[in-house]
């Protein structure tokens, strides 16, 4: 009987899905779909490859220098967020809201932005010569 109980416990813990509650810390390969995160969070340098962030809300969130390769950001809300120098290689962002979002220096290679909304930010730089 003890062996059967041990086997059941072992199977439950070894085959645990990588699911997280919305309050759990962000990490690799986790399903955070449909979560609403606090506005204006500093998540700079987050490690989120292969994560599911679909239908999640990240308003004015700092994702600068984050690694989000192969993640699903579809139908997420990311207005006024920053992804400066973030790695979004092969991420899926179908139908996501990126209005006033800053992607300066980000790796957007093979990202699927089909149906995503965005507003282009034009930055003006003043160069002074002496």
In which residue ranges do the predicted regions lie?
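Tandem repeat scaffolds
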Residues: 20-130
């Amino acid at each position: 009987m003890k062996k059967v109980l041990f086997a059941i416990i072992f199977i439950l813990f070894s085959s645990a899905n990588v699911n997280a509650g919305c309050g759990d810390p962000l990490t690799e390969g986790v399903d955070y779909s449909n979560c609403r995160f606090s506005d204006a969070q500093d998540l700079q340098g987050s490690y989120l490859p292969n994560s599911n962030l679909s239908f999640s809300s990240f308003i004015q969130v700092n994702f600068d220098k984050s690694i989000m390769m192969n993640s699903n950001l579809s139908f997420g809300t990311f207005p006024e967020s920053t992804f400066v120098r973030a790695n979004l290689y092969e991420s899926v962002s179908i139908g996501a809201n990126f209005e006033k979002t800053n992607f300066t220096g980000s790796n957007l290679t093979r990202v699927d932005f089909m149906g995503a909304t965005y507003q282009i930010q034009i930055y003006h730089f003043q160069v002074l010569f002496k």
